Amino acid sequence: MTVHRRVLGLFLSLACVACSVSQDQEVAIGKQNAEQVNASLPIMQDSLVADYVQQLGESMARTTSRADLDWRFFVVDSREVNAFALPGGFVYVNRGLIDRAEMLDELAGAIGHEIGHVVRRHSVQQMQQGAKANVAVSLTCTLTRLCNSNVARTAIQVGGAALFARYSRRDEAEADSEAVIITMRAGIDPSGIPVLFDRLLEERKSSPLRIEAFFASHPMEEDRIRATAAEIKALDPSQLAGLRKDDASFHALKERLRQLPQPPEPPASQQLAPGALRGPG
């Protein structure tokens, strides 16, 4: 193959990855990754815990523009504070995050935030941008001959993909706004969103080890928390009237978790990075 043909092929590849990923493709990617996650992480099988989080998450997801997805919610039996979402409606919440939530509206806000990432298709956008970066790297190698070995190409491609493993601040702001809307539509007060995030930010300052995984994929600053609090404060009081902040079933969940054996403290390397997504094949 001549250099010109290779360049043409790479340009066509770049155009291809810019195309939209269909919902069926997104679900297929999410399902494959969910199978890998469920085989790698300790998913809680306790029926009270699993059913509660599934029902809470589903009641919220059904209020969104992507209610037609087969939403699945899982609890990871880990003390680390983390939550992440895969394309297609697969949402994971660590036990450590539930432990930090003191009221229903706080847990609902965290779950609503992850639902927001799926609604906005942030992971899909990351994968598309990562694919574009890898094609651009290959194009550079072809034109400049800087990459003269498979090892060099692989190293650069992996580095390019890693740039997109962390949600952008814009993604996080969009997910926060979605969480406000989603919790309200589900009949839950959104005020718990900034409350929980502020608590996590304070804990990060004093004991970061169990909480750093969350911040590794969810950039958070005080400005972001203040912005969400201001968004909620700007709502008409009538919009918040009658919304739930807490209920007995949430505290039954917390009590059940206290009764169950505590998970071991895993090394950080055992936690699957939320951005480490791979498509079918």
Predicted features and spans:
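N-terminal secretory signal peptides that target proteins for export/translocation
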Residues: M1-H4
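A Zn2+-metalloprotease active-site environment signal
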Residues: R6-G9, L14-G281
